[in-house]
Design a protein with these regions (language model features):
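Conserved small/polar residues in nucleotide/adenosyl-binding loops
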Residues: 176-183
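Residue-level recognition of short, solvent-exposed, well-ordered loop/turn junctions
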Residues: 8, 140-142, 176
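Short hydrophobic beta-strand element within catalytic cores of glycosyltransferases
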Residues: 171-172
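Terminal amphipathic alpha-helical/low-complexity segments used for targeting or macromolecular assembly
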Residues: 1-59, 115-118, 182
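Flexible, glycine/small-residue-enriched loop-and-beta-strand segment within the central core
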Residues: 66-76, 81-158
Length: 183
């Protein structure tokens, strides 16, 4: 089983395995390339995002800088807006619905360190090298959500549709769909 398969099964994985390191380096290079491209060069920026992300909807606007851990584990819906310093540690899958807006400095995190002391210590992997292991839990964000500045979304969180997350919030658990005024 590959380390990436372990991630998606919710098992401990070694984030420094060569297969994962190369995917992260690719994402970091593409994130940097995006950040070095001017906002008025929309076609180039969109092409970079399409290469970087697992899925990218239509009409997405991301102001730089952006940072993605893997990129390929992130799916972004249609007509989303991400303000400055949008950071996604997408070890596990991150799914963002349509018409979502993110204020500056929003961070979405999927990796988490083990809670048990024995698991936090370095473990010898199949190749005989001692590595530190971690888990990752997916994050799912429904359609029509709005995130204020400096929001942190923690591993394993599901946010329903039409939710408003106030500035400075740390989201640690399920947020149910909020009724829409159109309903």
């Amino acid at each position: 089983m590959t380390e990436e398969e372990r991630i998606f099964r919710g098992e401990l994985f070694a984030s420094e395995e060569p297969e994962l390191v190369e995917k992260k380096r690719r994402a970091h290079r593409l994130s940097q390339k995006y950040n070095e491209t001017f906002e008025d060069d929309a076609e180039v920026r969109e092409a970079i995002l399409r290469e970087l992300l697992g899925e990218l909807g239509e009409g997405v606007c991301m102001l730089g800088p952006v940072r993605f851990h893997y990129g390929c584990h992130t799916r972004v819906g249609n007509h989303c807006f991400m303000n400055f310093n949008f950071t996604v540690q997408d070890d596990a899958l991150v799914t963002i619905g349509d018409h979502c807006n993110f204020g500056p400095n929003v961070t979405i995190v999927t990796p988490m360190h083990p809670m048990l002391p024995d698991e936090r210590r370095g473990m010898v992997c199949d190749d005989g090298v001692e590595r530190f292991l971690c888990y990752a839990k997916p994050v799912t964000i429904g359609h029509d959500c709005w995130f204020g500045a400096n929001v942190v979304v923690c591993p394993g969180v599901t946010i329903g549709e039409n939710c408003v997350i106030g500035a400075g919030s740390v989201v640690t658990c399920l947020l149910y769909t909020s009724p829409s005024p159109r309903d």
